Curated annotation (Swiss-Prot):
Residues 854-1000 form the Response regulatory domain. It is found in: Cytoplasm. The keyword Transport does not apply. Disruption phenotype: Results in defective growth, deformed and swollen hyphal cells, an increased hyphal septum, and a shrunken nucleus. Decreases the number of autophagosomes and lipid droplets in the hyphal cells, whereas their volumes considerably increases. Causes a 95% reduction in conidial yield and remarkable defects in tolerance to osmotic and oxidative stress. Also significantly decreases the transcript levels of sporulation-related genes. Leads in a remarkable increase in trap formation and predation efficiency. It holds the Pfam family Response_reg. It comes from Arthrobotrys oligospora (strain ATCC 24927 / CBS 115.81 / DSM 1491). One of its GO terms (biological process) is phosphorelay signal transduction system. It comes from the Eukaryota. Two-domain response regulator protein in the two-component signal transduction system of the HOG1 pathway. Involved in multi-stress responses and is essential for conidiation, secondary metabolism, autophagy and endocyrosis. In addition, regulates mycelial growth, cell nucleus development, septum formation, and organelle development. Also regulates trap formation and thus plays a crucial role in pathogenicity. Keywords: Cytoplasm, Phosphoprotein, Two-component regulatory system, Virulence. This is Response regulator SSK1. Belongs to the SSK1 family.
């Protein structure tokens, strides 16, 4: 099953389902046959394409003497490979072990030699990469694992611990060198010297030959960037031919490489590096493999060195190649590449902790590049993808101090340090970029090889794929240069913030970075980095660094503080002061209206200034908006500003339009032309003087226009008549006093002196105004109404002139307190009533009675209609009903209605449309307020729009909207179409009574003549018969008729111009008072 999955993963790139199935089927059959054949063999490591002529020997396996006929000879069980993955076509060697070795033992090496001129047709088909991991154990590889304990299996080799770090140096353009691989014999190792394993994977793809000295030659190392990723197996790149090498040359090259490792190479290139780069690979203890590679030579740059040593599996890998500007450790892709291509892959990522169980073949799925999909973020995957990037960064060992790193990656494999240096020389770049400058970052020195670090060139596209290297030893620490584009960085020991330094202090930040680059420190040490030290001392908030508190106050107020920055102007401080004084200043002034005043200290602030006597003489002044406040405060207050030195926030002087009140005293008071009622205040300094306020009296002999200042009447009900221009409450339910409107009182020529009655006479003068809804007449008729006054105050008459003339007061007999004087639009002259009739009390509005009006109720709900009818019966007024809007318009055309209760939601025609129709007919026929400006000639009116002039249409009808909605929009809509008021259902009877009384009084004032004629008709004998009609519709009640007869004998007699022009003039005529029933 595992083979099937591997084959399926390998052939994912095949296009088409048919070809994919055929390819899978054939591959599966081949793999199954090969697996069954391998299970019968003793060694299941590698199946050579052609068996070498020289059979396995005790100490050496030789080929055909350099003939190159076979690629690998059949190996004994002792030297067999761990296993082979049939899902891949490459062959690999793995040398894992859990044992440690002593470097002082003798070398017992065995050589595998071969000729560089390998036969292309006899090479192995592909490559197999064996990784360490958690793959399950294969059946064919089980036997080899059992031989590890007794020493018969593959044994790991040690590094040459006496070698020094190796430096890279330029080499000739094309070089063929041979590096030797030396490993000691399997003697008793030191358990404490190493602590982890290093699996080394050798990918062999060329045909190798073993010479008689046991030297393996013919391994060609090519850059991964130059190896084509062949989608088709037929694409086979041509190999570069290798010249044959003699045994003596191989032995000399091996000795030179060993001596290069032993000689100190610190700061100077080694002998071996003059011809090329070499790395040593550790194989089993009885074998030494010499790898040859030929690559074009390019100028190289020497890199620092890192001491890396393996524990149970140690290897010194010497790769013969020309040094490149960058070094990349790449892995051979899992695809089938050229038969002549070879690659060296080292897996350093998914390494488990040391244990005795050997590694197994990797069966994880791979992507198109041959990398495992589940280890995409590993160091090997990232190095494989970044093959054109920087090489391994290495450092010199520093002070022998062991510090355990606080942060370690689970994927990191540990290696113990030794004096041996491992230098990787990677493939060439097609277009090698220029080496970029790196910014060193202090990294934790660890005892393990955490990640692979890359220095030198840097590509932004590979920013997230770089890794950093941290190596450690028990007694040695090494510094690692980490690339600035490292994907994984060590977190800082302090909490990271968005900004630690103010943007204006970029120079400080640049200085800290330069210091950090000059002398990098290690995170985890006591000192830490410069940036960390400075960041700990700096404030975490920008406001704490650049702000300042300033004292401000209002004139005579308490000081307070506002927070400003060091570069704020005075104009900015005005905004802050306006927010500080939101209620006192923010509601009446804008920010530019404020003025900031500064008061300098009275004495020098410092002792030096007092001694020298050179204190600057500052004076109080207003600050300009463009001045920097903090600089001014430093100049005025060198020792700092205190609350006593608070800046004063001033506002411009407000010009008061009120005229000064006259001086007190018993003299005449006058007012200027154009002075409003608001300026004429009583001595109580308010628009409404309390009732108990004592007002000084004025002699009655003063001439000119004077103001009534007699004592307030004791009766509170006449308070509204006392104030000249205060309108009465809008309804009985709203009796709260309101501020009078700006009504101007026109002044004319001076009026003559008023005459006074005899001392101790009856009442004082009262000025009357029409009720709300009426038009202010040109002349105001003043009458005397007796009111209780103080005996010490003589009675006086007050006249407000509007035109030249004199109005003489006429004394009258005391009338009932409930009787109010009548107001008519034409000028009238008061005459004394006949003495033969007695004054009787009449029914007025103050007695709680509703004027006699006719109400039209428009309601489609029968329940609401019956309730409104019951209300009208209790109010003793006439009414009529309608069930829809069209019927309401028809009944209104008959005339005689003073009030309409109109429901909004009505069938056929809703209340709003009915209201519009009524208002249109009133406008066309010139009724009410439209009588002065008719819309057009009367003959242009249609017959349907003409109203009967004989009917009573003297005033516009009052329409009140009734609805169950309390929304403001519905109310506005009703008032917009012509309704006078708005009521919400359900209607309270008490509230409705007050409203009907208010509307009746308004209608009596609007249509006084029509209402008087109706009174005359109702007063005729037999009009009502002393009984009410059925339902109260169309006729006045008996009580209303009796009230009308009593009103005919009213005490107030008015001679009207209209009545005087009648054919039978009457000296007196009884006129009912507005609002009287």
């Amino acid at each position: 099953m595992l083979l099937w999955k591997a084959a399926a993963t390998k052939l994912r790139g095949v296009k088409g389902m048919r070809g994919f199935r055929d390819k899978i089927k054939g591959t599966k059959t081949k793999l199954l046959r090969r697996d069954s054949k391998d299970s019968t063999e003793e060694a299941s490591a590698v199946r050579p394409s052609k068996t070498a002529k020289g059979g396995p020997g005790t100490g050496t396996e030789t080929g055909s003497g350099g003939s190159g006929e076979g690629s690998w000879g059949r190996k004994s069980k002792r030297h067999s490979l761990i296993g082979r993955d049939p899902s891949r076509s490459d062959q690999s060697l793995v040398a894992p072990s859990d044992r440690t070795f002593d470097t002082t033992t003798d070398l017992d090496t065995t050589s595998i030699s071969g000729n560089g001129n390998a036969n292309p047709t006899a090479s192995a088909n592909g490559d197999i990469v064996i990784e360490g991991g958690t793959a399950p154990k294969r059946r064919s590889a089980g036997k080899e694992f059992d031989n590890l304990e007794d020493g018969t299996g593959l044994q790991p080799q040690l590094l040459n611990t006496t070698a020094k770090p190796l430096e890279l140096s330029p080499a000739p353009p094309l070089t063929d060198t041979t590096g030797s691989i030396e490993s000691p014999s399997t003697a008793a190792p030191d358990k404490g010297s190493f602590n982890c394993e290093l699996p080394v994977v050798l990918s062999q793809k060329d045909s190798l030959k073993l010479n008689k000295n046991g030297i393996l030659v013919g391994v060609e190392s090519r850059p991964p960037s130059q190896i084509p990723l062949a989608e088709n197996e037929n694409l086979q790149p041509q190999p570069q031919p290798q010249p044959p090498q003699s045994n003596a040359a191989a032995t000399a090259a091996s000795a030179a490489s060993v001596s290069a490792l032993i000689q100190p190479s610190e700061g100077t290139p080694s002998k071996a590096s003059t011809t090329g780069q070499s790395s040593t690979l550790s194989l089993p203890s009885d074998k030494t493999v010499i790898l040859e590679s030929t690559t074009p030579a390019v100028p190289s740059t020497s890199t620092p060195s890192t001491n890396i040593a393996a524990t149970t599996t140690t290897a010194a890998i010497t790769t013969t190649s020309v040094p490149a500007p960058t070094t990349t450790i790449s892995r051979t892709p899992s695809r089938k590449l050229s038969d002549r291509s070879s690659d060296l892959s080292i897996n350093t990522t998914n390494l488990p902790p040391p244990f005795t169980r050997p590694y197994r073949l990797s069966q994880f799925p791979t992507d198109s590049s041959g990398l495992r999909a589940d280890t995409d973020s590993s160091a090997l995957s990232q190095l494989q993808r970044s093959s054109s990037r920087a090489s391994l960064g290495i450092h010199e060992p520093i002070a022998p101090e062991t510090v355990e790193p606080p942060f370690r990656d689970k994927r990191e494999s540990s290696f113990s340090h030794g004096p041996e240096t491992l230098v990787y020389t990677g493939p060439l770049l097609h277009n090698p970029p220029e080496p970029a400058s790196v910014v060193p970052v202090a990294a934790e020195v660890a005892q393990t090889l955490h990640t692979v670090s890359e220095t030198g060139t840097f590509q932004p596209t590979e920013l997230a794929r770089n890794e950093s290297v941290v190596s450690r030893n028990e007694s040695v620490k090494s510094r690692i240069l980490s690339s600035s584009g490292s994907r994984r960085k060590h977190p800082l020991s302090f909490s990271r913030r968005q900004s630690l330094i103010h943007p204006s202090d970029t120079g400080l930040l640049r200085y800290l970075l330069e210091q950090e680059s000059a002398s990098p420190t290690t995170y985890g040490r006591e000192g830490g980095s410069n940036i960390q030290s400075v960041a700990g001392l700096m404030p975490h908030s920008e406001n704490q660094l650049r702000t300042r508190k300033v004292w401000v106050k209002r004139p005579g107020g308490s000081p307070t503080q506002v927070i400003v920055t060091e570069d704020d102007f005075v104009d900015t401080v005005r905004d802050l002061c306006l927010r500080k004084y939101t209620n006192a200043l923010g509601r009446h002034y804008d920010s530019p209206d404020l003025m900031i005043r500064i008061s300098p200290p009275l004495k020098p602030q410092s002792a030096r200034a007092r001694q020298m006597g050179n204190m600057q003489t500052h004076t109080d002044r207003l600050l300009n908006p463009d001045e920097v406040l903090c600089q001014l405060l430093d100049d005025y207050y060198p020792n700092g500003q205190t609350s006593e030195d608070a800046l004063i926030v001033e506002v411009p002087q407000q010009q008061r339009s009120r005229t000064p009140r006259p001086s007190p005293g018993p003299h005449s008071m006058s007012y200027a032309y154009g002075q409003t009622v608001h300026d004429l205040q009583l001595p109580g300094e308010d628009y409404f003087t309390p009732v108990g306020t004592i007002v000084p009296s004025i002699p009655h002999s003063q001439s000119g226009t004077v103001r009534s200042t007699h004592n307030l009447p004791a009766n509170p009900s006449s308070l509204s008549n006392y104030i000249a221009n205060s309108p009465p409450p809008s309804s009985p339910g709203h009796r709260s006093l309101k501020r009078p409107g700006p009504v101007r009182m026109t002044t004319g020529s001076p009026v003559g002196s008023t005459t006074s009655s005899a001392p101790g006479g009856g009442g004082g003068g009262v000025m009357l105004i029409p009720r709300a809804g009426g038009v202010v007449p040109d002349r105001i008729r003043a009458t005397n109404v007796e009111a209780p006054t103080s005996p010490s105050v003589p009675p006086q008459m007050v006249a407000l002139p509007s035109s030249p003339g004199i109005i003489k007061p006429i004394p009258q007999k005391p009338a009932s307190p409930g009787v109010l004087p009548a107001v008519t639009s034409p000028p009238a002259i008061t005459r004394p009533p006949p003495k033969s009739k007695e004054i009787t009390a009449s029914i007025g509005t103050l007695d709680g009675q509703v004027p006699s009006i006719n109400v039209l109720i428009v309601e489609d709900n029968i329940i609401n209609l019956r309730l409104l009818e019951a209300f009208m019966k209790r109010l003793k007024v006439r009414w009529a009903t309608a069930m829809n809007g069209r019927e309401a318009v028809t009944k209104w055309r008959t005339g005689g209605f003073q009030l309409v209760l109109m429901d909004i939601q009505l069938p056929i025609m809703n209340g709003l449309d009915a209201t519009k129709e009524i208002r249109r007919l009133e406008r066309l026929n010139g009724i009410g307020s439209f009588s002065s400006s008719p819309s057009g000639p009367e003959d242009e009116l249609s017959s349907a729009d003409k109203l009967d002039k004989s009917l009573v249409f003297k005033g516009s009808v009052i329409i009140v909207a009734l609805t169950a909605s309390s929304l403001r929009s519905d109310r506005d809509e009703a008032l917009a179409v012509g309704c006078n008021d708005f009521l919400t259902k359900p209607v309270n009877f008490t509230f409705l009574e007050r409203k009907v009384m208010e509307w009746g009084c308004m209608q009596a004032l609007i249509d006084f003549e029509g209402w008087r004629k109706w009174k005359d008709l109702a007063s005729k004998p037999g009009a009502s018969g002393g009984k009410t009609s059925k339902g109260g519709r169309g006729k006045a009640s008996a009580s209303t008729s009796a009230a009308a007869k009593k009103g005919k004998e009213s005490s107030i007699s008015v001679l009207d111009n209209a009545s005087s022009s009648s054919s039978t003039p009457q000296p007196t005529q009884s006129v009912p008072i507005a609002g009287q029933s």
